[in-house]
């Protein structure tokens, strides 16, 4: 990566000039067959169309140069080969590799060395251990409950939901993440504990929410006359407080170099997916992810799908100045995927410190959010079409449905109607429509992209997961920030312990005056009502 900085790159000035008058998507006939073909890329079963982005050949050329100047390919090579990429210069930091790609490299026997080879070999061993465990115990349980928060819940939950429509399963799966006791209590009301396997996921083995929820659920099992070790397994780092086979039925390992939000292809996602759908389905997901890992190493942006998507996002964020971006999958199976991408993107790139340790002077991660289509058309699309802010949209769609069941009504299937709506929204946002009634007028020039595959399968889902991981990481490399730590989550947790001490009467008076004032207000006003 070029250490000069994002703003000092020669292509940054060129792109700033080009952004003064970007392509006008409302120009009649501009979204032509020629433009659609020119501004598209098909790789690994996916086609990305960006003809409805506010780009022309000059912009794409400058983005290509910027990617080269910022050393995106070499940085991706460094990450996948196990070099230390999680660091901040001259300050204490985690200072370690980011090796989520190694958790699936073994399925394609990708040649690796050093740290990457070590994690790939360990991942293969853990996968075989999981396969053996499932062979021995999968039929003994009808239900699995995964306890974990952040990356230990969002990614696995999104993947489990995504595969539900294409992979038969007679297993029930639940996730408990929130420290709110109602979360765990609701799950406990719905399960037969005697037939339930609980997997507790925590890298450190000390995550507060996870530890509390495990104890909450274990207490209920004990009251049912069930033994902890017969029903609880763990996924954690070697040597953590949870790495105890005398306590758990089984313990599976992850490693410090696997970030939580990037851990779904490790045992963090493998156990629950293997239990729900079988080991072979998890293996197919790994194959898709590994294929996209290789695609992310392509040296030219014109052949590198996640890099192209990343640089289009850079154009929208840093040069057109759009502060937020919405992800809209036209697939019921991707119901929870936007929430996973929200964490992956904003926790990775929601930074204002460069890896040089300096405060940066430009925008980084946009606010990410989303919902499936067509549901979202009936909620927030009003704002996308006519709101005061321009919000770029990333559409995700599939030509065929997962379950193979459909019906023809008024000459078209439901799948065709779904796909037609996605394409129509992209065109409508770009072109707009004039009307003498200003309330019915659409100004257009609302950029979007469409990422399309044939069908959502385990392989496709793995590739889609890795596509977004690499898109996010490429943007971090371009900005020169550390996409692999999350110091921003620590301050609130530290203060929560102080507040809890005040609530328990264990803190010295004046330890946190702000908390004391707020607690006094809420206790006095709410107790009056009760």
Swiss-Prot record:
Catalyzes the reversible isomerization of glucose-6-phosphate to fructose-6-phosphate. One of its GO terms (molecular function) is monosaccharide binding. Its EC number is 5.3.1.9. The gene is pgi. CDD domains: SIS_PGI_1, SIS_PGI_2. InterPro entries: G6P_Isomerase (IPR001672), G6P_Isomerase_C (IPR023096), Phosphoglucose_isomerase_CS (IPR018189), SIS_dom_sf (IPR046348), SIS_PGI_1 (IPR035476), SIS_PGI_2 (IPR035482). Pfam families: PGI. One of its GO terms (cellular component) is cytosol. Pathway: Carbohydrate biosynthesis; gluconeogenesis; Carbohydrate degradation; glycolysis; D-glyceraldehyde 3-phosphate and glycerone phosphate from D-glucose: step 2/4. The active site is at 347 (proton donor), 378, 493. Keywords: Cytoplasm, Gluconeogenesis, Glycolysis, Isomerase. Its main location: cytoplasm. This is Glucose-6-phosphate isomerase. It catalyses: alpha-D-glucose 6-phosphate = beta-D-fructose 6-phosphate. Belongs to the GPI family. One of its GO terms (biological process) is glycolytic process. It is found in: Cytoplasm.
């Amino acid at each position: 990566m070029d250490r000069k900085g994002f703003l000092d790159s020669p292509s940054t000035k060129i792109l700033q000039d080009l952004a003064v008058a970007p392509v006008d998507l409302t120009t009649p006939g501009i979204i032509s067959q020629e433009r659609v073909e020119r501004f598209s890329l098909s790789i690994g079963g996916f086609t990305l169309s960006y003809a409805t982005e506010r780009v022309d050949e000059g912009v794409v050329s400058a983005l290509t140069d910027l990617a080269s100047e910022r050393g995106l390919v070499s940085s991706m090579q460094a990450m996948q080969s196990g070099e230390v990429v999680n660091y901040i210069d001259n300050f204490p930091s985690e200072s370690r590799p980011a090796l989520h790609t190694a958790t699936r490299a073994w399925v394609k026997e990708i040649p690796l060395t050093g740290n990457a080879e070590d994690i790939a070999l360990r991942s293969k061993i853990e996968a075989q251990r999981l396969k053996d465990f499932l062979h021995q115990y999968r039929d003994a349980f009808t239900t699995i409950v995964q306890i974990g928060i952040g990356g230990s819940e969002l990614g696995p939950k999104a993947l489990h939901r995504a595969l539900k429509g294409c992979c038969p399963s007679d297993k029930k799966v639940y996730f408990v993440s929130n420290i709110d006791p109602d979360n765990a209590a609701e799950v406990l009301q719905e399960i037969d504990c005697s037939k339930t396997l609980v997997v507790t996921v925590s890298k450190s083995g000390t995550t507060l929410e996870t530890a509390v929820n495990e104890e909450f659920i274990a207490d209920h099992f004990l009251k049912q006359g069930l033994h902890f070790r017969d029903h609880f397994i763990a996924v954690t780092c070697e040597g953590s407080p949870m790495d105890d086979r005398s306590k758990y039925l089984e313990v599976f390992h992850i490693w410090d170099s696997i970030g939580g939000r990037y851990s779904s292809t490790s045992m963090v996602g493998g156990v629950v997916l293997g239990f729900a759908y079988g080991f072979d389905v998890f293996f197919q997901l790994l194959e898709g992810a590994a294929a996209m890992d290789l695609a992310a190493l392509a040296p030219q942006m014109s052949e590198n799908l996640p890099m192209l998507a990343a640089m289009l996002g850079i154009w929208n964020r840093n040069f057109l100045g759009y502060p937020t971006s919405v992800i809209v999958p036209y697939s019921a199976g991707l119901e929870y995927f936007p929430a996973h991408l929200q964490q992956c993107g904003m926790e990775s790139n929601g930074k204002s410190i460069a890896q040089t340790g300096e405060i940066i002077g430009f925008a980084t991660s946009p606010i990410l959010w989303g919902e499936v289509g067509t549901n979202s058309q009936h909620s927030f699309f009003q704002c996308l079409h006519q709101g005061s802010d321009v919000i770029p949209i990333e559409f995700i769609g599939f030509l065929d449905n997962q379950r193979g069941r459909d019906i023809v009504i008024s000459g078209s299937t439901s799948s065709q109607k779904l796909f037609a709506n996605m394409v129509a929204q992209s065109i409508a946002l770009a072109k707009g429509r004039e009307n003498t009634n200003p309330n019915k007028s659409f100004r257009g020039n609302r950029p979007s992209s469409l990422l399309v595959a044939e069908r959502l399968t385990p392989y496709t889902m793995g590739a889609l997961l890795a596509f977004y991981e690499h898109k996010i990481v490429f943007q971090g490399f371009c900005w020169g920030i550390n996409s692999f730590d999350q110091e921003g989550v620590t301050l609130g947790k530290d203060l929560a312990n102080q507040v809890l001490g005040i609530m328990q009467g264990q803190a010295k008076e004046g330890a946190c005056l702000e908390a004391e004032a707020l607690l006094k207000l809420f206790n006095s006003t709410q107790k009056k009502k009760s």
